[in-house]
């Protein structure tokens, strides 16, 4: 009888150890999968940021709420007569944005100036035409347009896509001098279109130069241990810590960049109106507070305001003093 119970206990303990081992292995595989997924997200974001060719594209990837504001400011830039009340209202609504709008404007102007495009430059005529050393021109150089500027990837170069030829009147002089300088027409290539094009075989991913990084050494007296699903190994503390204390790269909380940070919890951003508006409208018989979006019953009316010698504003349920022009 005792032998049978011993055998049963041994079988039960073996089963428990087997289940625990499977659970630990499953958590380890899940942690590795999560880390790979985080790296993939980071690499994809890095590629998108590197490929951004305008400030608008960069903001759209990195800070979506500033991108919305930037689009609005571009839309409002043509409106010169914006009253001070409206301007103050908007500056309050956009107080949570990450970048200053004026700074973005300066950066955008600088970016546009450095884009790949035809630029006026000076070229040496003799070198351009491949003339011999005993022939030279006066003036020796002419102004033409050539492609120049920066591209957004290391594997491409700013190159011309269309060319025209312009004629310049110059003096051609040969040595030894046998006659007076001759006035001749010279045709010089003038770039009219430019584009960032690959200089060689294109790889699926652009080569990214990085500084050499020394792998982080584990100074813990014992090797890394497997941690529970909601925890990670911390090399500095030599123990398992909660993911909130030591999050994986790319998994940090970026909720402050989302729409609630820009407009508040009860509002959403209206790109057409270029301002924050309430998410849910109030029923027809209630008035909506413009700041906290709460619904309330209007106590004022046209009659009550007339008795106070004031003007009734139905949208805000407020009585306003008459403004009489002189």
From Swiss-Prot:
- Main subcellular location: secreted
Residue ranges the record assigns to the propeptide: 22-93, 211-326
Glycan-bearing residues: 160, 190, 292
Q: Name the tissues where it is expressed.
A: Highly expressed in the spleen, kidney, lung, tongue, ovary and mammary gland.
> May I ask which residue range the UniProt record assigns to the signal sequence?
1-21
User: Which keywords does this Swiss-Prot/TrEMBL entry list?
Assistant: Angiogenesis, Cleavage on pair of basic residues, Developmental protein, Differentiation, Disulfide bond, Glycoprotein, Growth factor, Mitogen, Repeat, Secreted, Signal
- PTMs per UniProt: Undergoes a complex proteolytic maturation which generates a variety of processed secreted forms with increased activity toward VEGFR-3 and VEGFR-2. VEGF-D first form an antiparallel homodimer linked by disulfide bonds before secretion. The fully processed VEGF-D is composed mostly of two VEGF homology domains (VHDs) bound by non-covalent interactions.
Entry's localization field: Secreted
Which InterPro entries did the record assign? Answer: CXCXC_repeat, Cystine-knot_cytokine, PD_growth_factor_CS, PDGF/VEGF_dom, PDGF/VEGF_growth_factor
Consequence recorded when altering residue 141 to S: Inhibits ability to activate VEGFR-2 and VEGFR-3
One GO term in the molecular function aspect is: vascular endothelial growth factor receptor 3 binding
Q: What biological-process GO terms show up in the record? A: dopaminergic neuron differentiation; fibroblast proliferation; induction of positive chemotaxis; positive regulation of angiogenesis; positive regulation of cell division; positive regulation of cell population proliferation; positive regulation of interleukin-6 production; positive regulation of mast cell chemotaxis
Naming one, the record's GO cellular component terms include: extracellular region
> Sorted alphabetically, which SUPFAM superfamilies does this protein's record hold?
Cystine-knot cytokines
Q: Which family does it belong to?
A: Belongs to the PDGF/VEGF growth factor family.
Summary of subunit composition and partner proteins: Homodimer; non-covalent and antiparallel.
Q: What else is known?
A: Indolinones; MAE87, MAE106 and MAZ51 inhibit VEGF-D induced activation of VEGFR-3.
Protein name per UniProt: Vascular endothelial growth factor D
């Amino acid at each position: 009888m005792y032998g049978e119970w011993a055998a049963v206990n041994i079988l039960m303990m073996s089963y428990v150890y087997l289940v625990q081992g499977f659970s630990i292995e499953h958590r380890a595989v899940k942690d590795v999968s999560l880390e790979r997924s985080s790296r993939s997200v980071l690499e994809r974001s890095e590629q998108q940021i590197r490929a951004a060719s305008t400030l608008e594209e960069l903001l759209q990837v990195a800070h979506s709420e500033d991108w919305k504001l930037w689009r609005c400011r571009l839309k409002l830039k043509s409106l010169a007569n914006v009253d001070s009340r409206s301007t103050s209202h908007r500056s309050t609504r956009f107080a949570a944005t990450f970048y200053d709008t004026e700074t973005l404007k300066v950066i955008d102007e600088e970016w546009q100036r450095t884009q790949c495009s035809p630029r006026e430059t000076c070229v040496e005529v003799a070198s351009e035409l491949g003339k011999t050393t005993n022939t030279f021109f006066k003036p020796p150089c002419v102004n033409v347009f050539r492609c120049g500027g920066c591209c957004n990837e290391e594997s491409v170069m700013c190159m011309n896509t269309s060319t025209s030829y312009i004629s310049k009147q110059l003096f051609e002089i040969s040595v030894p001098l046998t006659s007076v300088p001759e006035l001749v027409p010279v045709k010089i290539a003038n770039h009219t279109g430019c584009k960032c094009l690959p200089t060689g075989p294109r790889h699926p991913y652009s080569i990214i130069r990085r500084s050499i990084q020394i792998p982080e050494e584990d100074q813990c007296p014992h090797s890394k241990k497997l941690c529970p699903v909601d925890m990670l190994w911390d090399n500095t503390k030599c123990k398992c810590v909660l993911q909130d204390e030591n999050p994986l790269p790319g998994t940090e909380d970026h909720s402050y960049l989302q729409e609630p940070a820009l407009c508040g919890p009860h509002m959403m951003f209206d790109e057409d109106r270029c301002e924050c508006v309430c998410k849910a409208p109030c029923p027809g018989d209630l008035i909506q507070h413009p700041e906290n979006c709460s619904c309330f019953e209007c106590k004022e009316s046209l009659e009550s305001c007339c008795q106070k010698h004031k003007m009734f504003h139905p949208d805000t349920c407020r009585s306003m003093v008459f403004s009489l022009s002189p």
